[in-house]
């Protein structure tokens, strides 16, 4: 009998190039991870709550109130839902919340394009431009929930009273694309006032004061970028701001300028408004054609051995739905996305950062 020869196959899948290029590597698989050099199932999951929202959720946030109550918030294109630790769900969206879109849509409706183009009575051509699926940015201002969705554009606050809907923050700018609460307790309104490059912030610890004066720390700035602001996240004592083309940081420096802004990366823009995850080693995100990490100082592109598989079979029309999350127990970042023929999320790609 011939002796058994141990196979030492490196961890991770390889899907770049041909099958021959992947010789000696794992080629395909799903819902597995490597631990201590061995391939194992991820372990499964279970539903926490059925019927959390009537529509697909495009943004979630969990936090704890001052009394220890656990809360989970999530938003769809029609709802803003909150749930207690006991699984009781309440819709706290304002009654006049702007109706958004469950899916990205081709921009061919009234008002799209320049006046006088194309022929009267003829169908408008599809130029490949899409209105994004509605997504939410959610955060907590102390124990209160603050929220903004891409179609409504107002900054909302919910003060933990399930009998009262979220209310518009007084004096805050409108037509915003998203928000973030900084480590220093300022609210950043991103895409402020409909300007895709503008950031406005309230006075410190006062989210109803937005007009800059010598006696407060409110302010605004227009980023020097050729792109539009997509998202922001807290990391390592600063705020990372991602546009669709580059990356910037905001660092608190006190009056008179309050914040200092610096571009820290180029050609590394975010593919969606939910594509970044902050972990202890930095921020990871998906770009248009790759994956990136900010370590607190600089941006680096991540080597990806499944790059061709992911980006060659993705429904880019629905890329606004791409969602990242941190699976901290296993030191992983996951990205959920739509495959080429799918209107809804049906695939994932995961990166082990430990």
What is each PLM-predicted segment?
Residues 131, 160-181:
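Asp-box/WD-like beta-propeller blade repeats and closely related beta-sheet repeat scaffolds
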